[in-house]
C-alpha cells in the first residue's frame, strides 16, 4: 500500500509497483524478468528491519543487472538505521536513502535525478551521495494527509493478495500513535503524533479497492481506535456506502472498546469481522515494564465487548520480557485462553533499533543479538531473560504455546461469518492436522518437531540471494547457538537421531538431503 500511495503522488514519471512476497520461491527470476521488461532508471525498496538483508540482496541484483540503475531504500529500517546503512558495508548498494514519510519526497527525488541532480540538497528527508559519501539532508516534517491521494492500485504489477479466502486489499485511515510503549518504533517514524486522513478520502479509497475486486480490506492504522468518535464515523460512512459482501479486519488497542463497547454493534453492521488486539501481556508487571496503558481489566472488558457481537478477536502478545520464566509465559497464554481467544499472534520481545526497550535491555545485558537483523521478526529470540538463555526462551515459548493454546479452534465469530469453512475445519481438517502433528512428534520427538517448525519459519524471509563477500558483524542463531549450521536439521537427519543406535550406525554414510 505504501508504495502504491507513493506512486499515486507522482505525475511526471512512469512508476510500477511489485511486492516480492507474492513471488516467494520465484522471487529472483521474476525480479530479473521485471528488470529486463521495464529497464528502469530507478528501483526503490521499502523494508522493515528483519527484511533488510533480503532487500539488500535485491538491490545487489539490480546493480548487477545494470550498474547505472539508481537504488533507493525507504521505510522503517531506512529511517531508524540510516547512519549505519550510509557508512556500512552495503553503502555501495544504495544511491539514496529516504528517511521518514516518502509520499512526496520520492517524486521530488525523481524530478531532481531527471534534472541532473539539481536541487537534491533541498529535498527534506533525503540522504544522497556526494563523491561517494552520503550526505543527510535535514529531517522531513510530517506530511499533511489531506494532500495525499489514494493509492494507485493500477500501478501494481502483481495480484493475488487474499485474506479469509477472499481477494484482499489494504487501506489506512490514520497514521501514528500517542501511546508510549517502549518496544515500539512508531515514534521514531512519526514522532508522538496522531493524524487523520479526511473521511471522504478514506471512503473513496474503500470504494476504489472494492471496484478492483477486493472483498476483504485490512486497515493498517497504527492505532485506529485512539479516536473512537472518528472510528464510529468511519463505520457509519461504510454503512452508507452499501457495498455488498465486503468485510474488514483492523488492528487496535482494547482500551477504546473498554470505554466505548457500543461501537462494536456498528462495526459488525459495517462489515468488521475480525480485529487484531494489542493485548501484549497478561501480567500487570510486564505491562508496566512495556509502558503499556492497558490494564488487565480494560483488556478483558474490551475483548468482552467485541466477542459479545461475534467479532473474531486475534490476540497479539509478547513474551521474553526481562524477568520472564516458563511460569510467567504459561500464565500469559492462560490469560488469553481464559478469555475464549483461540487465534494468537505471539512474539518474542525484539530490541528494535532506536526503541527505549532496546536501550534498557542493552544496559541490563539482556540483548543477545545486536546486528544480525534477519532474526528481528518476532518469531525468534534475540534476547535473554533473567531465567532463560535465548535458545531456551525460543524453545520454551514454542512448547508452552503448544500446550496451552494448542491447535486453533473455531469461536462463535468464526461460525457466524465463515460457517462453511468452519465446518470443514472442525469436522475434517482439524483432525487431519492433529493426526499429522502426533505422527511428527512420535517420529521426531518434541525437540525434533520444534526444530522442523523453526526451519519452516527460517524460510519465510529467505529468498535465496547471497551477496558475494558480504560479511556479518556477528554470527547468531536463536535455535542452534552462535556457531551452528542453521539448516542442518532436516526430516531425514532428525529421523536418524531418533533411530536405535545400530540403525544410526548403519545409516551414517547416507547423506541428508538439504
Residue ranges and their predicted role:
Residues 146-314, 319-321, 326-334:
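Radical SAM [4Fe-4S] cluster-binding motif and immediate context
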Residues 81-82, 179, 229, 285-290, ...:
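Flexible glycine/acidic-rich beta-alpha junction loops that bind and position SAM and/or redox cofactors
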